[in-house]
Amino acid sequence: MTPLLRKLLTTEAPPATVLIRVVVGWVFLSEGIQKFLYPEALGVGRFSKIGIPAPHVMAPFVGVVEVVAGGLLIVGLATRPAAVALLIDIAVALLSTKVPMLEQRGFWAAMHEARTDLAMLFGLIFLISVGAGPRSIDARIVARPNG
């Protein structure tokens, strides 16, 4: 295993990290699936409404990223890279939807609407910082004799 790969997969997180990892992963996995199930409300239609460029390309792309990276978080495989991809996703979501709301409706309305996004943001920062935890595929890969 290369030193970079070992560093990406190594974790010193407590066992309870699995709770954060699975919940954050599940939220993104379900959001990604919903972009395909309800395209007008949550996919292409929503992306068009909020002014995301090329919504017919970006909505499916974001949906796939959320499904794949969310699934990776759930099982604890490539946790840090998956969390980075989702961190970019949630940062764009906050900037494109919550910042305009802050300007239009004020602080408290924006905070109310951003509560889940902010929880996911900090959950992702936590996972990037500490890794997947001992109950993960990442930890099993590193623990292998040739890992």
Language-model features: where?
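Membrane-interface interhelical connector segments
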Residues: F36-A54
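Extended, low-polarity transmembrane helix blocks
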Residues: M1-Y38, H56-V64, V68-G71, V75-G147
